């Protein structure tokens, strides 16, 4: 092999890069373990304190658990800006560790839809003409079953029902007068609406992004999904779904506030500091807790700085100055700083400061008009990037509301100033706002006005002069990005397009931990089985394949981390499947080398020719599988995309390691004169010299397959499927009980409860389904009750109906808060999903499109690659045959087998994976047929095909067995969540292997033979 040195160098560098990427995950876990040890010390110290003796026995466990969690969180917050690994802070390390999906980590996945229908109405100033209303209604109706965005659908509907009325008459409102002129064409008006929609979606995205930052979760994710108006939010580890729903769907509240001067408030802060010291000292239990906090701080300081501090002096200062120990006053060099900022605090201390300032005894010290608010971004005055400014807001109105809200802002944009060319923000207001703004700026010349969104301060510029006319320029040392962010904030105050939750998934941390354990166990077992199988079958060469497999796993995980890919439970299934498929390339190569050795070639020549002859089959097979992975990634979402990502990356790393790593090892051994064994006495002549007439038996297999396909179609037509909630819409809950329960009893109780609620509220078409999920103490409950209503009140109502129906089935009393909370609660709702009907239709439509596109792409690739469309037809027929029988199996055995066989996104992922895997078999066989036709051009087609099928039997069986072994490991040890996926893949492997030999190839032969006979008849 040429360039061995370069390949070896690249492999070493790639391995080093992967180890470097994975090292961040290791360091992160080390720091988290230290946090746990630190938290344990805090728990032990509290157990030995006088305060612990006063805690009721029933509350002691909860109290200690709370201290453990809070201490661990406090430790990690404290080191977030500390360098813990080669110059990287803990925060940076955490950002670079491997991302776990919600199904492994627990948390919440939410898809929000920006309601463009409301935006279009608002831009028309809620036009009430019948034609406009009809066009809106028609566009809304069509949006359910269309991939077009709402504005395109509205444009089409207006052309149908508008009666020739120009859109300029509808949208030429006072506020839109600068953008829509009387002479504007319909196309120009639609273009304006699109720009406003894009702005509204962008503003909603920014509002949501900043709200998410306030949850304090690690590695949150938010992404805008094209121009659909949908925003996907992932919050790993969040444990308060109700709070998330309310905060994400809340209306953006933009306000303008006057401010106090720091010098006006500082004396009151000093008084508050003294009063807090007295309050905390008066309460003995609070004192003990504060002492413990001081000890915790000392422990942490020792661990981080490794130097001794005067613990007693520090403790005394904290007791005497509790507020100033966490809030640094805006006092520098003994002088009170100018401006509205009254102090600085670490992010982890802001909640404590808020709590203290709200205490009645403390609140009474400050002026009645005083309202403290935090900046949304860290202060630039304090290094570290984790310190925020506390600003003194002045409430001048009688009702305590802001003197001016964002509803008066008509536009905000970034422009460049006349002096210096720095970015600045230009803001325009309507007539009402202009008058109020003139009064407000006139009263605060030389002072600062705070721009507040959702209770957080985005900017508080100084007023230079009274501003009249409603147009203002906000200047500062803005970067372009900062100026754009501020402009978006100002525009968000007039957001006419609310965002509502249309899809939601909640996974409790306990279920996530169980999924991790199950996934890791299945991965390790599958990995060991594959390693063992390769050694048993191929001896020394099998050991070399195992080395390549180890490198493959390293490269695969390293690549996943470097790309920031999210590892999900289906993703682990993809990893395990990759292990099985990774050895396929080695099997193809080894079988080729064995053929060359049997032909009498020397070891070195056999290896060279074996690799050369195996390349085309390996590349073609892996490309077809990768193509289905790409289709799956494009049309899938969430965990399905995670599965596709690991599959695609795994295919690439598998090809590289199986071809290059093994070849380097073989060449080195050959160069040193060492022997390499490719078999043992049991496997040496395995399936060699077989003379099976496969094509002669095709009529029998046609009958068998035809019967199975007819049975599948009948089951699909008459029995149908058990659809997952992502295909039907509705809400699904996995509920864990503290005892074993009967599915029939749960079904009866839940159905009765939801039917009663439906009758009481005049809700139609309510369906309820209950299935055992895992053990006898877990049930999966799906309901379509109020599926079309998406408010948080309905979510709470559904959970309450479910709670009332199920609370009698718990041995221990459980409150509704305990039942619905995923906060480390072992029982009650441990996971939930909500899918709106529009999203369900989109998912179902995309699934069907994905399957057909995959088949078309594979047909085209094989037809082009083998230069004959009949070969593509044979391959696609084999795939369709496999898919139909697997789908029929899920239809027929749903409700019969003791595990769920739902047809959902994961099932579609399995079907597409089966298509990608099964075509691999076809490609290897077709490649051998092509080779035999080249070697024996005068032989009959039937003879060449039978010879090719017999010669590839060993490869086909070995690949199928290794892949089956890993899939069985997933099915047995992978847990309930992915068992259905594993079953589908096992069926697909078995049926796909059969179909590639007995269906795809015979179909190709029959069609090719018919064409040849037809040509022969014409030539006569």
In which residue ranges do the predicted regions lie?
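Pore- and gate-forming transmembrane helices of large, multi-pass membrane proteins
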Residues: 208, 510-530, 549-550, 581, ...
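Interfacial segments of transmembrane alpha-helices in multi-pass membrane proteins
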Residues: 2-4, 425-426, 430-445, 449-450, ...
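Cytosolic juxtamembrane regions of multi-pass inner-membrane proteins
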Residues: 580-624, 667-675, 891, 897-959, ...
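Non-transmembrane, solvent-exposed regions of membrane trafficking/translocation machinery
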Residues: 19, 23, 27-31, 44-462, ...
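Juxtamembrane "pre-transmembrane" interface segments
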Residues: 234, 469-473, 481-525, 529, ...
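Hydrophobic alpha-helical transmembrane segments of membrane transport and translocation systems
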Residues: 2, 8, 12, 551, ...
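Transmembrane helices with small-residue packing motifs
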Residues: 15-49, 90-102, 113-123, 688-739
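Small-residue-enriched core segments of transmembrane alpha-helices in multipass membrane transport
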Residues: 12-15, 543-564, 575-582, 643-658, ...
